[in-house]
UniProtKB/Swiss-Prot annotation:
The gene is nifW. It holds the Pfam family NifW. May protect the nitrogenase Fe-Mo protein from oxidative damage. GO terms for biological process: nitrogen fixation. The keyword Iron does not apply. The keyword Membrane does not apply. This is Nitrogenase-stabilizing/protective protein NifW.
Amino acid sequence: MSALTSQLEEFRRCSTAEQYFDLLDVDYDPRVVAVNRLHILRFFAEEIAGLHDGADAEVSPEVLLRDYRAALIRAYEAFTTATALDHRLFKVLKDRAPEPAGFVPMSEITVERPATTQTDEKGQQR
């Protein structure tokens, strides 16, 4: 068994974020992972699910591990530049998403002024 195949098998046995980071040799700040662990793992899972159209068995271990590493980096960086609320990966956060404020362009705004009354020379309203 090659070292890459062995590493791929080890990847499949990983169960913590730190194990993925260590195995794929991705630097990380433990504080970022501690706060965003589930969100990073969810983002990572979604990223790898979209790789190779589900045909991982047909892809070499070297390519798989390279692509998994890139996906983990994307997942991690997503939470170093934004928050879990920004990404809303979990249903509980999606359900609490604020409704976007309605936008009314200036061209649609009209002003109606009350009719003014005018008087003639005799003081009567017209």
